[in-house]
Amino acid sequence: MKRGGYRQINKALNISAFENYLDIQHDHLPKLNDVEQLSPRVLRVLGQNAGKFTLQGTNTYIVGTGRERLIIDTGQGIPEWTDLISSTLRDSAITLSHVLLTHWHGDHTGGVPDLIRLYPHLSNSIFKHSSSNGQQPIIDGQVFHVEGATVRAMHSPGHSHDHMCFILEEENAMFTGDNVLGHGTSAVELLGIWMASLRLMQSSGCRVGYPAHGAVIADLLAKIAGELDQKARREARVVRTLARNKREEQSKGRSKGSMTVQELVTAMHGKGLDDQVRTMALEPFINEVLGKLAGDGCVAFEVRRGEKRWFIVNDVTSSP
């Protein structure tokens, strides 16, 4: 199992994306065509793996304007995608020169064996950061050229340790992978690193986002700003809750005012929570926030009677 394996990812999907996915039920997502020319240089082919966390399915992108083009991501290995990509390439007289993978998760890499089976010349042209199994490495800043398209790689960990975005220079656009989705928010392995990657993506100035899931992002900079603001507000709420508890406990002669994650969730969201919402979504998400805040030096924990209890290091807020 690779670092941040599927157990963690599936758990994380329930964590940081949970509130957003409740608001964006799958049935209410806009319909995307199986194959759609999004711009003169970008052709999207849906992965045929629609689901709660894959949205309309994994977007695979054929990039370029000439006969020879590259593809970004390969879907989940669904036979219907294999048939669709094969017929699309055949009908458009397109051949593939490179396969670029945004990261290692199976809904992005699962189609690689089928591509190699159909097009054996690609066996030495599969590119991924932290490469394995005969793949070629991608270096931060590496540039891939095909007719009509210059694609520059940007290492952007957070959703996964090996996550890459790709900038399409001719369009001032970015293939955002799973760091930024077309709908809702992404699951992350390390919240602080993901937020730093979003700031890096923001600094590129790319206006349009081609996400790995969901519709085209017309204003990528605004979407990223909204993601960062949302996470900052959630962090601030955790800090306020810990600070308030510390003041209340200090008034009773208890110095740290530490709380378990369960107590923190109850203080923030009340006692009437559904058990599954609490254990599968809110508690793991708050754990991720606390981990980031600990890395920032804002909070720490103590272990009492076998329980990890969190407390604020400095009461930085006087909010009630």
From Swiss-Prot:
Record: active site: 107 (proton donor/acceptor)
Record text on cofactor binding: Binds 2 Zn(2+) ions per subunit.
The protein's required cofactors: Zn(2+)
Disulfide-linked positions: none
Reaction catalysed by this enzyme: atrochrysone carboxyl-[ACP] + H2O = atrochrysone carboxylate + holo-[ACP] + H(+)
Residues reported in the UniProt entry to bind Zn(2+) 2: 107-108
Gene Ontology BP annotations: secondary metabolite biosynthetic process
Pfam families named among the record's database cross-references: Lactamase_B (PF00753)
SMART domains: Lactamase_B
Top EC class, one word: hydrolase
EC numbers, comma separated: 3.1.2.-
Biological or metabolic pathway of the protein: Secondary metabolite biosynthesis
Keywords carried by this UniProt record: Hydrolase, Metal-binding, Zinc
Residues bound to Zn(2+) 1: 103, 105
GO molecular-function terms, A-Z: hydrolase activity; metal ion binding
Gene3D superfamilies tied to this protein: Ribonuclease Z/Hydroxyacylglutathione hydrolase-like (3.60.15.10), Winged helix-like DNA-binding domain superfamily/Winged helix DNA-binding domain (1.10.10.10)
Keyword Hydrolase: yes
InterPro entries xrefs: LACTB2-like_MBL-fold, Metallo-B-lactamas, RibonucZ/Hydroxyglut_hydro, Sec-metab_biosynth-thioest, WH-like_DNA-bd_sf
Keyword check for Protein biosynthesis: no
Role: Atrochrysone carboxyl ACP thioesterase; part of the gene cluster that mediates the biosynthesis of geodin, an intermediate in the biosynthesis of other natural products. The pathway begins with the synthesis of atrochrysone thioester by the polyketide synthase (PKS) gedC. The atrochrysone carboxyl ACP thioesterase gedB then breaks the thioester bond and releases the atrochrysone carboxylic acid from gedC. The atrochrysone carboxylic acid is then converted to atrochrysone which is further transformed into emodinanthrone.
Similarity comment: family membership: Belongs to the metallo-beta-lactamase superfamily.
Name of this protein: Atrochrysone carboxyl ACP thioesterase
Native source organism of the sequence: Aspergillus terreus (strain NIH 2624 / FGSC A1156)
Gene field: gedB
